[in-house]
From Swiss-Prot:
Homology family: Belongs to the ThiG family.
UniProt binding sites for 1-deoxy-D-xylulose 5-phosphate: 157, 183-184, 205-206
Subcellular localization, as worded in the UniProt entry: Cytoplasm
Assembly behavior: Homotetramer. Forms heterodimers with either ThiH or ThiS.
Species annotation: Clostridioides difficile (strain 630) (Peptoclostridium difficile)
EC number: 2.8.1.10
HAMAP family: ThiG
Domain of life: Bacteria
Task of the protein: Catalyzes the rearrangement of 1-deoxy-D-xylulose 5-phosphate (DXP) to produce the thiazole phosphate moiety of thiamine. Sulfur is provided by the thiocarboxylate moiety of the carrier protein ThiS. In vitro, sulfur can be provided by H(2)S.
Name this protein carries in UniProt: Thiazole synthase
């Protein structure tokens, strides 16, 4: 069976979801259910063990794999510190590295991300680094023992789609590591396109959370990701510059 494998762990769903920007946390369980997702990311600052109502973990089903992120880190040192706190709080070994010092476009700092990835991978973390699409940075993250790489499709929260499509395509073609397209995906059709290209998974948050009906949108993304993966495995037909008839154009009337 076709499974997503991250750090030796197998997952049936190739859709990862987030926890931010929802009007109410109460909708999260239903969103997660309809998405079919098995991995959910969250900022560590949203975990409040002393306040059940404010603790995001209260709303996440126990069977989900938690992917804490280092949101708020502006350099490798801060990201490493957040990851270690996450482990001490019982959030497990998965960690999504986010190192962002740019406050306007929120673009990840690849150099600091590589540094943090190496340190945390050496400590036994299953590291999924969020990155600006770049082949050379991707290779260095592999050398740093990342479990996957997470190139952005467009600036985070923008819903602009796959603006970095060609750079992501190069990474898919050249890197022997799971590629999870993260950030910028605004429509199910864009998630499907990423999967048709050969991405191993996508992470979607804003597009679901900001939808008129987040629950229905979660299901739409589930179906899109599944359809895109099926199309990639089936291998789409060749693109032709000219028309090609699907039925013979000659000989029929002459035989009557």
């Amino acid at each position: 069976m076709d499974k997503l494998v991250l750090g030796g762990h197998e997952f049936n769903s190739r859709l990862l979801v987030g926890t931010g920007k929802y009007g109410s946390n109460n909708i999260l369980p239903e969103v997660i259910k309809e998405s079919g997702s098995e991995i959910i990311t969250m900022a560590l600052r949203r975990v409040d063990l002393d306040n059940k109502q404010e603790n995001i973990l209260t709303y996440i089903p126990k069977e989900m794999t938690i992917l804490p992120n280092t949101s708020g880190a502006t350099n490798a040192e801060e990201a490493v510190r957040i990851a270690r706190i996450s482990r001490k709080m019982g959030c497990g070994d998965f960690i999504k590295i986010e190192v962002i010092s740019d406050t306007r476009y929120l673009l990840p700092d690849n150099e600091e991300t590589i540094k943090a990835t190496k340190i945390l991978a050496d400590e036994g973390f299953i590291v999924l680094p969020y990155m600006t699409p770049d082949l050379y940075a991707g290779r260095r993250l592999i050398e740093a023992n990342a479990a996957a790489v997470m190139p952005l499709g467009a600036p985070i929260g923008s819903n602009r789609g796959l603006q970095m499509k060609e750079m992501i395509r190069i990474m898919i073609d050249e890197l022997d590591i799971p590629i999870i397209v993260d950030a910028g995906i605004g429509k199910p059709s864009q998630a499907m396109e990423a999967m048709e290209m050969g991405a191993d998974a996508v992470l979607v948050n804003t597009a679901i959370a900001s939808a008129g009906d987040p629950v229905q949108m979660a299901r739409a993304f589930k179906l899109a990701v599944e359809g895109g993966r099926e199309a990639y495995i089936a291998k789409t037909g060749n693109v032709s510059e000219f028309a090609n008839a699907s039925s013979p154009l000659t000989g029929f009337l002459g035989n009557l």
